[in-house]
Amino acid sequence: MPSTVEITESLIREFITRAVTDVFRTMLSRVPTFSAPADIGGDKVAKSVGTENRPQVVGTVGFIGEVNGLVYLHLDLAFARMCTCHLLGMTEAELDEAGDEVINDAIGELTNMTVGGFKNGLCDSGYPCMLTIPSILRGTNFSIEPISSAVRHVYHFDCAEHRVVADILMKPSE
């Protein structure tokens, strides 16, 4: 299927905003608010996505096809725990007993649903692609360096008094 719509920054912003809003409203009963994006462009320099020095849980899912890329969804640990408890109907005590793997699974699934919504926007615009399996990164004060040929877009959302950051790396297929 030939590509019919140019992938612009405004289109990417529209797709990720719709995906984050739909997933968080449906799965968490929370409505995130879009904040102005931190425009990084194609810089190879590792840059912070503004998540401060708090422990982070970062879900990532890739997409491959007519356009390739990764979406990293950054949540601070406190919000990741809150999301997990809500998704699974658990108390904080039950979550403590269940351990970090449950948080990883829940954030992996939230990320998968979010990137699935983003991917659907790409497919509907003439860029068919498929998702990769989700993976999780955990840490404090780390940054992600894009490859030189990738274009980077970082979008911030405020949700339940927490910051959610969608860090998108994209490049056309070769």
Predicted regions span which residues?
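N-terminal auxiliary interaction/assembly segments of multi-subunit proteins
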Residues: 1-174
